[in-house]
């Protein structure tokens, strides 16, 4: 049976993650309050941010930026795409 959480992103009960997806306090907070579906939404958002800003995840500044965006995505005002972002509809 799946673990259920009240997802802060979806504002509904949903299947929870199997384990904390990120180290430390933020990872535990996400594990306790974010659903699998919302985590999948974040992975798509993170991929877009990495591609649009040409980030290297191994770079400490990029990791710090992505961590702030992740916290905003789930617990703040959300994570906005870059100003000139236009999704490819092809």
From Swiss-Prot:
Top-level taxon in the UniProt lineage: Bacteria
The keyword Transferase is assigned to this record: no
Alphabetical list of InterPro entries matching this protein: Fe_traffick_prot_YggX, Fe_traffick_prot_YggX_sf
GO molecular function terms noted in the UniProt entry: iron ion binding
A GO cellular-component term linked to this record: cytosol
Pfam family, one: Iron_traffic
GO biological process, one term: cellular response to oxidative stress
Family: Belongs to the Fe(2+)-trafficking protein family.
HAMAP family linked to this entry: Fe_traffic_YggX
Purpose of the protein: Could be a mediator in iron transactions between iron acquisition and iron-requiring processes, such as synthesis and/or repair of Fe-S clusters in biosynthetic enzymes.
Name of the protein: Probable Fe(2+)-trafficking protein
Annotated source species: Halorhodospira halophila (strain DSM 244 / SL1)
Record lineage: Bacteria, Pseudomonadati, Pseudomonadota, Gammaproteobacteria, Chromatiales
């Amino acid at each position: 049976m799946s673990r259920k959480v009240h997802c802060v992103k979806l504002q509904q009960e949903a299947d929870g993650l199997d384990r904390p997806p990120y180290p430390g306090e933020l990872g535990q907070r996400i594990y306790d309050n974010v659903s699998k579906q919302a985590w999948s939404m974040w992975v798509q958002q993170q991929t877009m941010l990495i591609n649009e800003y040409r980030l290297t995840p191994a770079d400490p500044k990029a990791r710090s930026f992505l961590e702030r965006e992740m916290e905003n995505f789930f617990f703040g005002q959300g994570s906005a795409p870059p100003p000139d972002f236009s999704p490819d509809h092809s």
